[in-house]
């Protein structure tokens, strides 16, 4: 069974950092996540990506990857799986204003994923509160799976 994470973004909302509390350069608190085959396949079904690299062991074994992998977009699931319920990124009303990702190696079933994340900058534009943030996902061997920079508009 895949590890569960809190999907009620309103729960403990008052405990999260608000705009004034976010310090550029300060690391965000993160938690390791064991990526299971079940989680990969549930994610793939949810987004409609049924490629055999994610479902068919025999097919995947013959591929250049030598086994089942997760799709590159799995970082979306990992972002929330690797952050605790009180992380400011989970604040209700947060808007994704854009992102740019680089993919190095695929995540695999059984990988223990860790996230290094921090706010890089914050600014106000047209009365909106923006945060630029940096995220790097690693597997249990310290290899970078993917890294990215995102822009969010904060609710407060």
Where are these regions (language model features)?
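Hot-dog-fold acyl-thioester-processing enzymes
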Residues: 2-96
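HotDog/MaoC-like acyl-thioester-processing domains
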Residues: 1-20, 103-156
